[in-house]
Amino acid sequence: MPTPSMEDHIEQIYLLIANKGYARVSDIAEALSVLPSSVTKMVQKLDKDGYLVYEKYRGLTLTPKGEKLGKRLVQRHELLEQFLRMIGVDEERIYNDVEGIEHHLSWNSIDRIADLVQVMEENPDIVKKLEASKTQHNL
């Protein structure tokens, strides 16, 4: 079971590879606002645990296990952002809120939130009622 820090690294590596075609230690460190030496230690651990293959000075690649988890972590993050947007959380708070909660929810809870988002998309009146409620509470 990966730790929250492991998840953050895998998620960033997945995003970097998806966007740039590669992920370097320096890019990961910059994206996570940590020291490159910390990333190197984590990458070595992720290599040992089978999430990626790391060769010093040659870069890294996700294994199928790492790619599958990376994709799921990105989807979780996007789902939580979508959910918070739907329930009317202020845009400038969404990213930090997602970062604060994403590692503390079980995959079962994430799946239920996905179901709820789908219900809300299929029933726009629910979202309108939430918007009206937010307006009423912000008086």
UniProtKB/Swiss-Prot annotation:
SUPFAM superfamilies: Iron-dependent repressor protein, dimerization domain, Winged helix' DNA-binding domain. Keywords: Activator, Cytoplasm, DNA-binding, Manganese, Metal-binding, Repressor, Transcription, Transcription regulation. GO terms for biological process: intracellular manganese ion homeostasis. Mn(2+) 2 binds at E11, H77, E99, E102. SMART domains: HTH_DTXR. GO terms for molecular function: DNA binding; DNA-binding transcription factor activity; manganese ion binding; protein dimerization activity. Homodimer. PANTHER family: IRON (METAL) DEPENDENT REPRESSOR, DTXR FAMILY, TRANSCRIPTIONAL REGULATOR MNTR. This is HTH-type transcriptional regulator MntR.
